[in-house]
Amino acid sequence: MTQPQMAPICLVENHNEQLSVNQEAIEILDKISQPVVVVAIVGLYRTGKSYLMNCLAGQNHGFPLGSTVQSQTKGIWMWCMPHPTKPEHTLVLLDTEGLGDVEKGDPKNDLWIFALSVLLSSTFIYNSMITINHQALEQLQYVTELTELIRAKSSPNPAGIKNSTEFVSFFPDFVWTVRDFMLELKLNGEDITSDDYLENALKLIPGDKPRMQASNSCRECIRLFFPNRKCFVFDRPTHDKELLQKLDSITEDQLDPKFQEVTKAFVSYIFTYAKIKTLKEGIKVTGNRLGILVTTYVNAINSGAVPCLDDAVTTLAQRENSVAVQKAADHYSEQMAQRLRLPTETLQELLDVHAACEKEAMAVFMEHSFKDENQQFLKKLVELIGENKELFLSKNEEASNKYCQEELDRLSKDFMENISTFFVPCGHKLYMDKREKIEHDYWQVPRKGVKASEVFQSFLQSQAFIESSILQADTALTAGEKAIAEERAQKVAAEKEQELLRQKQKEQQEYMEAQEKSHKENLEQLRRKLEQEREQDIKDHDMMLKKLMKDQKAFLEEGFKKKAEEMNKEIQQLRDVIKDKKRNTDRIKEALLNGFSTVLFHYLVRYLKHL
């Protein structure tokens, strides 16, 4: 992103508790091809969320700050700008309307705002006031609803792995900001960090009371869904009530020094550690991809469905892969047009350029495509490249045929115009001398191309009757000499035909060898792509397993043995899935490659018919 967005714009509008996507905001995202770092903030209304986002934007003004008890932000607002510390990246700030606004009727509306913020962000900030206690955790009840609001897969996992277990592979990092914090950071008389404070607050507390179980449920969900957690505790910005009403217009030196210190640390942390938004299997999200995700999720919500990551990625893949196919096909056509000088001297010259351009086009597709089930889009690219290759072959033949015919017409012009002069005694020898001179001069012409022999052979065939007529009219020759000359002419014609046939067979062999080499290179690129996807898939499942085992150990240490034991079955199921993926990957990969080979063979047969 070269220029920052001048001001925030509403991304997801919330009118009468109905969510809709602002197309103007989508158009902004659609122009951003860079990877995006997406930072979203949620929290109760009137807790200063917008102020923190303006700090990240480096502006006093931007996201509106309210000075009354009414919530200022409605829906989800977006501000895009070049990332201040990561070149070639775009920072996307998402400010959300306050949760728990008494003026809103349906609490489900808050849940969707919360869920969308989680789905869209790479760093998720929860902003609250005063302290992290039972009340604060109860106010964060939305996190316990995520299993009902978000699905990782479009169908139940056949291995029995919970939907929520897969959240860790695509959920954002979690940052809890506590405002107007008045307590000392101490635990059992020892100084602790704000991170220690958060982790201690998230420990499960024994007890069967409903309120205790509710706050424990929230603690457990935060721990299970968000493995990477951070906490910042802020003093009051100022103790001057009047200044609090106009934070967007006061100078930095009017703010409390401790508040300034933590604010700077918070901004530095976000700029340094907030990651690129990624989906499962390591798919990096760009601005235009983010726009597709927003639209897909909001459409799902409005249709009464639950936003599903797999469905969103499939939608994304369909569009992105179509674009990748066109981008790769265009690259092939453009490079072929630039590098080829038609007509080429030989077929091999064209095939060499084709091979280089096809390899580059395949690399372009591999770079920009993902989740290409059954190589559907790769096969489409192979077909398009094949069609374009056939077009270049035809153009090359046409250019060669045209050039050869023009040169032959030029060289034989006087010869053809004065053909009658050969119907004289000794005319046959004069005719042959002149024709051989034309042939010699013709083969001296450079870069005639692949049709050179065929064009000259056609010329010779057109001269067969004329030569025979001149021969028969030559009174200087005996009947025997005429017969010998006739036989020699037929023999030369037959040899020329055989030579032309051998050339075509040679070109056919060159074509097949080039196609086989190209086939192997394409398969190798596909193999590398599948291998990368396999490694990323195993890596994602390994991360899930390590996270489950870490959580299980923590529950045991906190005395929740039963809860830890309940995790054994899922841990074993996850181990089995990983083992199966490692064991069966080669077989699955080869099946895919064999299917792709069949398609390539089909196109090979089709192109050979061209020769």
UniProtKB/Swiss-Prot annotation:
Broad class of where this protein is predominantly found: cytoplasm
Name the Gene Ontology biological process terms: adhesion of symbiont to host; cellular response to interferon-beta; cellular response to lipopolysaccharide; cellular response to type II interferon; defense response to Gram-positive bacterium; defense response to protozoan; response to bacterium
The enzyme's E.C. designation: 3.6.5.-
CDD domains in the record, alphabetically? GBP, GBP_C
InterPro entries, per database record: G_GB1_RHD3_dom (IPR030386), GBP_C (IPR037684), Guanylate-bd/ATL_C (IPR003191), Guanylate-bd_C_sf (IPR036543), Guanylate-bd_N (IPR015894), P-loop_NTPase (IPR027417)
Gene Ontology terms for molecular function: GTP binding; GTPase activity
Q: Does the keyword Transferase apply?
A: no
What's in the keyword line of the UniProt record? Antimicrobial, Cytoplasmic vesicle, GTP-binding, Hydrolase, Immunity, Innate immunity, Nucleotide-binding
Q: Indicate which residues the UniProt annotation says bind GTP.
A: 43-50, 65-67, 95-99
Q: Which reaction does it catalyse?
A: GTP + H2O = GDP + phosphate + H(+)
Q: What class of enzyme is it?
A: hydrolase
Where, subcellularly, is it found? Cytoplasmic vesicle
Instruction: Tell me the PANTHER family matching this sequence.
Output: GUANYLATE BINDING PROTEIN
Protein name per UniProt: Guanylate-binding protein 6
The source organism is: Mus musculus (Mouse)
